[in-house]
């Protein structure tokens, strides 16, 4: 695009100043050179672009180098933000060489790896999936109508912070939680209407105001995490929601079982799997992201699916807890994935049902390359 403008000005190249003062000087010079033939407009929130319609060139400036990188909107058990530098050392060579066309996450969760991946690599196709319908609806709402979502979040946050004491805030939290649970299962999760937008806003609100940022469902499918006792609540970042909306713009968003991604997989695909972790003990049982438990049978089914994807030729990286943290003789994953590469990395617990016991633990990373 800049080459097109340079040709118009009979120049080998052209530079654009970020400073508004010097940009105005550059604008004047360009207009003088072309004797009024170019119409230049400045808009510091849009990407640099050139529109040659009607023989007029419109230049729109964006602070592209400093724009906010999308980050997770929700706090989610097993978040991987701190492990990304380690993961980057484990990525397949084909990804680094630009030979991966499709990127897929069948267990999107909070999406830390996903957002990092989109900020550093280009793909022809990106697919995310999760079995949690509330989570996926929230991503769809952010993608389609971020401003409407922010408006509701702002009202919820302001009302919460205006309440006089924790007793009133607690009542308001449970009021929103009850509304959230009442709507679950009654919504059409394929339609983004006012009810869906409100539901997504409530999802974010209770995620930020509940105890320890934990998402947990009971056997009936109801969100059952208690009040987090926060004096002041900051439940959203406007800039980040807009950045996430932009990141999701061309992403295929699925809501279902992990095996549903297979139609998008070929030999030029990289898949990162971050399934609900196998609990290390009773107090770390945080795989209740939906009313259907992700037990050892589900882990075995996932390992068979891993084999199937491997046969297609996809590159796969999978995370999980390391049973050897509590039982050195537990070979569960070592046996399931004995034909693949298994490495152990150090990680910090960020969510615990009791808010205690946080510290360094070993996690496993399985790759087929």
Describe the residue ranges of each PLM region.
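Conserved proline-anchored active-site loop of SAM-dependent methyltransferases
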Residues: 1-16, 26, 87, 103-117, ...
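Conserved Class I SAM-dependent methyltransferase catalytic core
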Residues: 8, 299-348
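Class I S-adenosyl-L-methionine-dependent methyltransferase module
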Residues: 15, 23-60, 120-249
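S-adenosyl-L-methionine
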Residues: 40, 50, 55-102, 107-108, ...
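Mobile active-site "lid"/loop adjacent to the S-adenosyl-L-methionine
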Residues: 222-231, 277-299
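A structural motif corresponding to the C-terminal end of an alpha-helix
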Residues: 237-252, 303-316
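Short loop/edge segments at beta-strand edges and connector loops
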Residues: 254-256, 346
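Class I S-adenosyl-L-methionine
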Residues: 335-369
């Amino acid at each position: 695009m800049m080459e097109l403008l340079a040709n118009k000005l009979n120049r080998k190249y052209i530079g654009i100043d970020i400073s508004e003062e010097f940009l105005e000087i550059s604008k004047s010079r360009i207009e003088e050179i072309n004797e009024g033939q170019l119409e230049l407009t400045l808009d510091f929130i849009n990407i640099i672009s050139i529109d040659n319609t009607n023989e007029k060139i419109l230049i729109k400036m964006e602070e592209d180098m400093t724009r906010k990188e999308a980050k997770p909107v929700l706090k989610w058990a097993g978040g991987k933000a701190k492990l990304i530098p380690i993961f980057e050392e484990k990525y397949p060579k084909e990804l680094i060489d630009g030979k991966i066309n499709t990127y897929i996450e069948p267990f999107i969760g909070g999406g830390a790896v996903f957002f990092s991946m989109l900020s550093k690599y280009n793909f022809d196709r990106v697919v995310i999936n999760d079995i949690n319908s509330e989570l996926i609806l929230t991503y769809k709402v952010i993608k389609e109508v971020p401003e409407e979502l922010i408006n509701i979040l702002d009202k919820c946050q302001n009302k919460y912070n205006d309440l006089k004491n924790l007793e009133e805030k607690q009542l308001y939290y449970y009021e929103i939680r009850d509304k959230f649970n009442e709507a679950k299962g009654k919504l059409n999760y394929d339609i983004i209407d006012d009810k869906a937008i409100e539901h997504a806003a409530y999802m974010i609100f209770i995620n930020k105001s509940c105890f320890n940022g934990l998402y947990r469902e009971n056997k009936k499918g109801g969100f059952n995490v208690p009040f987090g006792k926060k004096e002041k609540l900051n439940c959203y970042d406007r800039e980040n929601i807009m950045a996430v909306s932009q990141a999701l713009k061309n992403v295929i968003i699925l809501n279902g079982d992990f095996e549903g991604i297979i139609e998008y997989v070929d030999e030029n695909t990289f898949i990162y799997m971050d399934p609900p972790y196998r609990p290390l003990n009773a107090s770390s049982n945080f795989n209740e992201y939906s009313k259907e438990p992700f037990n050892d049978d589900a882990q075995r089914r996932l390992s068979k699916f891993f084999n199937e994807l491997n046969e297609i030729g996809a590159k796969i990286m999978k995370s999980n807890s390391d049973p050897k943290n509590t039982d050195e003789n537990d070979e569960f994953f070592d046996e399931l994935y004995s034909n693949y590469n298994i490495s152990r990395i150090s990680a910090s617990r960020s969510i615990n049902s009791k808010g205690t016991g946080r510290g360094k633990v070993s996690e496993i990373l399985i790759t087929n390359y």
